[in-house]
Amino acid sequence: MAELGLNEHHQNEVINYMRFARSKRGLRLKTVDSCFQDLKESRLVEETFTIDEVSEVLNGLQAVVHSEVESELINTAHTNVLLLRQLFSQAEKWYLKLQTDVSELENRELLEQVAEFEKAEFASSNKKPIIDITKPKLVPINEGGTTELLNKEILRLQQENEKLKSRLKTIETQAVNALDEKSKLERVLQDLQLDQGNQQDFIKAQDLDDLENTVAALKSEFQKTLNDKTENQKSLEENLAAAKHDLLRVQEQLSMAEKELEKKFQQTAAYRNMKEILTKKNDQIKDLRKRLAKYESED
């Protein structure tokens, strides 16, 4: 259909609609003609009429014709709505959204093209068109194999999208929980380190008290020896030197004990488990962040 730019199938659909419209128009014109014929047969029986009688006849005819024309216009509008509804229903089954340009309905050039097409199409027959009662309806396109596959694919994609959204939400929840658990573990580790420091401080304080008591005792003994001016001064000096050596040895032992305590604490199962848990949680957080970045890039 070169004039309207439609393919053969759509051309046949347009011709069928034109045939239907011409038939309805012909029936309505017959009705209008019958109004005038009824008026002639029922009212125009006198040879002369007064002005009032003529006005009454014309007013009655006007009312009848007005009613018939109005009824036809309303019916035509409703018919066009039903036709659009059929087309839109088919489009929606393909997940399409059609648009109409109402301003084109008053395009004189296009209207003339349609008139020429109608004239050329129906010029070969002088008979008035007859409504094709057996005219087939629009076939629902969802019965075809292609449409069924398309609908299934759309449904599958929608379901997959919902699954991805749910999975992303689950991953986000896991990430938040992992961060919370990491924070808790860090606080526990800090508490353990603080307890360790307190224990070391307690041990240091206790050893220092012992050393101070020992030194004080030695000083007291040395002072007593000096005051007594006994002949054991040399022995006392040796004892003092030995005490100093003992002090250094005790200090060294204290340092070694501190290192040993720290080493033993690091070798304890609680410390190793805590360190292993923190390492695993850090790895999980890194993995979750990578996965979140991957899903964000896909969206």
UniProtKB/Swiss-Prot annotation:
InterPro entries xref list: LZTFL1
The coiled-coil segments of this chain are 145-299
Q: Which UniProt keywords apply?
A: Coiled coil, Cytoplasm
Keyword hit for GTP-binding: no
Q: Where is this region: Interaction with BSS9?
A: 145-299
The record describes the protein's role as: Regulates ciliary localization of the BBSome complex. Together with the BBSome complex, controls SMO ciliary trafficking and contributes to the sonic hedgehog (SHH) pathway regulation. May play a role in neurite outgrowth. May have tumor suppressor function.
Q: What protein family does this chain belong to? A: Belongs to the LZTFL1 family.
**Quaternary organization:** Self-associates. Interacts with BBS9; the interaction mediates the association of LZTL1 with the BBsome complex and regulates BBSome ciliary trafficking.
PANTHER family in alphabetical order: LEUCINE ZIPPER TRANSCRIPTION FACTOR LIKE, LEUCINE ZIPPER TRANSCRIPTION FACTOR-LIKE PROTEIN 1
Task: Quote the protein name from its UniProt record.
Answer: Leucine zipper transcription factor-like protein 1
User: What's the encoding gene here?
Assistant: Lztfl1
